[in-house]
Amino acid sequence: MVKFMPTTYEIIIYGRIQHVGFRERIENLGHALGIDGIVYNYEDGTVRILANFPSERKKKLFKDKTNFWRVRKCK
């Protein structure tokens, strides 16, 4: 079995994602996947995720599109 080294990611989410429970859903999903990090709202309307996890978990984080239907862009 191959072990993946954790990497720190800063993910910036753009779209109509504030005041709709998006941050809380992402925090809950991260906890369920065993991802350590923080999710916070910025004044410019973006949501930023700073998290440390192995790259194979990134696919799981973004797999369920129902959590991201309001997302316009992710960087």
Curated annotation (Swiss-Prot):
<dbReference type="Pfam" id="PF00708">
    <property type="entry name" value="Acylphosphatase"/>
</dbReference>
<dbReference type="InterPro" id="IPR020456">
    <property type="entry name" value="Acylphosphatase"/>
</dbReference>
<protein>
    <recommendedName>
        <fullName>Acylphosphatase-like protein MJ1405</fullName>
    </recommendedName>
</protein>
<dbReference type="GO" id="GO:0003998">
    <property type="term" value="F:acylphosphatase activity"/>
</dbReference>
<dbReference type="InterPro" id="IPR001792">
    <property type="entry name" value="Acylphosphatase-like_dom"/>
</dbReference>
<dbReference type="InterPro" id="IPR036046">
    <property type="entry name" value="Acylphosphatase-like_dom_sf"/>
</dbReference>
<feature type="domain" description="Acylphosphatase-like">
    <location>
        <begin position="8"/>
        <end position="75"/>
    </location>
</feature>
